[in-house]
């Protein structure tokens, strides 16, 4: 097997996942913050800020899932039974969230749809964090197949990861509102962003300490020499960006806090890659162990490379077309 094909596919899936987290993350964050809006006018302004983008952002989730199925079928066959419950919860929650987003705009009574949008966004985020936590703590595998139980994922660490992601997406949503809205919505979002930034830093600290204490392989990766000398800039830069984001929020900057939040997510993602690569199903299955035959990888890679520029071009165009702040009375429905 050509060693580089699984690496390329791991990069494609990795990019798809991080793009989904960054882009759909602020959509979900808006839903997480929905209960804190004071009235329907504020909620309308919040939804208008994401109306042109939210459905396109989920394209990356489809690409990541399809890429995993096509390029790493053995990993897909292990991950799915290990996380059936949180995956189903995530998908159902995303469906209800999407339905609520569209129907609240045309419904006379928006209360039920508001609840569905908030609950769907929060549950989808919690499920994603639980899946992440379950992967970090490891999936039992025997003879290439999942050998654990249906609820092995239900651990304190996984739920802490789920709550941490809720705080993270909430921060993305709050800083997005700071960047895209005006008036009371932006002011409340700025206050929420400060509180959520503290929560995110606390969550990152807890997870960063918990992980190496319970997973010796990750502790070795980070703290053995000479690895430590090369990796210490990651937490240091994270702390610096968090400090700058706080200062920018205090200085009432609009765009920089959102960019800083995205940088925090990228650094967190980099930490995950450092901790686990080349394992796709920690702690036993690598990208080479689970890869499809080279012919399948090449065929699907050609199709992906043809479609990916179109998707990226469309997304860039939409974000450029609807740049700037959402004004009162504007609607994209």
Say what each PLM segment does.
Residues 1-13, 67-83, 136-156:
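Helix-coil boundary and interhelical linker segments in multi-pass alpha-helical membrane proteins
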Residues 53-123, 142, 221-229:
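Membrane-interface helix-loop-helix modules in multi-pass inner-membrane proteins
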Residues 103-253:
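Long, contiguous internal "core" modules enriched in hydrophobic/ aromatic residues
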């Amino acid at each position: 097997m050509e060693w580089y094909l699984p690496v390329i596919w791991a990069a494609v899936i990795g990019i798809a996942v991080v793009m989904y987290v960054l882009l759909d993350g602020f959509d979900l964050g808006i839903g997480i913050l929905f209960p804190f809006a004071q009235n329907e006018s504020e909620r309308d302004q919040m939804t208008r800020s994401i109306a042109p983008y939210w459905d396109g952002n989920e394209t990356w989730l489809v690409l990541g899932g399809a890429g995993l199925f096509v390029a790493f079928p053995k990993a897909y066959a292990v991950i799915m039974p290990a996380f059936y419950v949180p995956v189903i919860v995530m998908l159902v929650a995303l469906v209800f969230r999407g339905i609520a987003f569209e129907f609240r705009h045309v419904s006379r009574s928006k209360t039920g749809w508001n609840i569905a949008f908030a609950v769907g966004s929060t549950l989808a985020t919690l499920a994603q964090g639980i899946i992440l936590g379950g992967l970090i703590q490891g999936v039992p595998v025997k003879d290439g197949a999942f050998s654990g139980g249906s609820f092995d994922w239900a651990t304190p660490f996984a739920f802490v990861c789920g709550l941490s992601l809720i705080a993270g997406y909430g921060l993305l949503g709050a800083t997005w509102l700071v960047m895209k809205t005006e008036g009371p919505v932006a002011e409340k979002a700025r206050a929420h962003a400060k509180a959520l930034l503290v929560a995110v830093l606390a969550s990152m600290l807890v997870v960063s300490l918990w992980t190496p204490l319970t997973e010796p392989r990750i502790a070795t990766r980070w703290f053995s020499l000479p690895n430590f000398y090369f990796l210490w800039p990651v937490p240091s830069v994270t702390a610096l960006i968090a400090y700058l984001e706080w200062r920018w929020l205090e200085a009432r900057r609009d765009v920089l806090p959102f960019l800083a939040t995205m940088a925090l997510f990228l650094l967190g993602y980099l930490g995950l890659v450092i901790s686990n690569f080349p394992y796709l199903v920690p702690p036993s299955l690598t990208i080479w162990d689970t890869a499809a035959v080279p012919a399948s990888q090449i065929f699907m890679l050609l199709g992906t490379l043809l479609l990916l520029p179109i998707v990226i071009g469309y997304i860039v165009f939409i974000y450029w077309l609807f740049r700037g702040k959402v004004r009162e009375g504007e609607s994209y429905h």
